[in-house]
Each structure stands twice: as structure tokens, then as C-alpha cells.
């Protein structure tokens, strides 16, 4: 009998932990990219084309 209890299931727990952490960080980074960067670029582009349409409408 050893003084230490055998370590069982460590690999399975580690794999599950790594997968959960990976998906969580991936989701956070994707959300940051979408709401922090992408939406600002799209809003700027839409404002540009709306302004351009107003200028063309005023010319005619």
C-alpha cells in the first residue's frame, strides 16, 4: 500500500478543462472583434455611403 492515493482521471479532467478554456477564450475574443472592431468599421462605412447618397440627392 502506498502512502499516496493513486491519481486517476487526471488526463480526462485536464483535456476537458483545456477545451472549456479554449472555447471560452475564443468566444470572448470573437465577441471583442465583432463588437469592438468590426461594428465600428461597418458603422463608419454605412455613414460614408449615407452621406454620399445625400450629396447625390442634393445635386439632382
Curated annotation (Swiss-Prot):
Transmembrane residue ranges: 16-38
Pathway connected to this protein: Energy metabolism; oxidative phosphorylation
Topological domains, Mitochondrial intermembrane: 39-57
Propeptide stretches in the record: 58-60
Recorded GO MF terms: cytochrome-c oxidase activity
Annotated localization: Mitochondrion inner membrane
Chief localisation class: mitochondrion
Membrane topology label: Single-pass membrane protein
One GO biological process term: mitochondrial electron transport, cytochrome c to oxygen
One Gene Ontology cellular component annotation held by this UniProt entry: respiratory chain complex IV
Record key words, sorted: Cleavage on pair of basic residues, Membrane, Mitochondrion, Mitochondrion inner membrane, Oxidoreductase, Transmembrane, Transmembrane helix
Keyword hit for Mitochondrion: yes
Keyword Mitochondrion carried by entry: yes
Residue ranges annotated as Mitochondrial matrix topological domain: 1-15
InterPro entries documented for this protein: Cyt_c_oxidase_su7a_fun (IPR014368)
Record's function text: Component of the cytochrome c oxidase, the last enzyme in the mitochondrial electron transport chain which drives oxidative phosphorylation. The respiratory chain contains 3 multisubunit complexes succinate dehydrogenase (complex II, CII), ubiquinol-cytochrome c oxidoreductase (cytochrome b-c1 complex, complex III, CIII) and cytochrome c oxidase (complex IV, CIV), that cooperate to transfer electrons derived from NADH and succinate to molecular oxygen, creating an electrochemical gradient over the inner membrane that drives transmembrane transport and the ATP synthase.
Subunit structure: Component of the cytochrome c oxidase (complex IV, CIV), a multisubunit enzyme composed of a catalytic core of 3 subunits and several supernumerary subunits. The complex exists as a monomer or a dimer and forms supercomplexes (SCs) in the inner mitochondrial membrane with ubiquinol-cytochrome c oxidoreductase (cytochrome b-c1 complex, complex III, CIII).
Family membership: Belongs to the fungal cytochrome c oxidase subunit 7a family.
Protein name: Cytochrome c oxidase subunit 9, mitochondrial
Originating species: Candida glabrata (strain ATCC 2001 / BCRC 20586 / JCM 3761 / NBRC 0622 / NRRL Y-65 / CBS 138)
Gene giving rise to this polypeptide: COX9
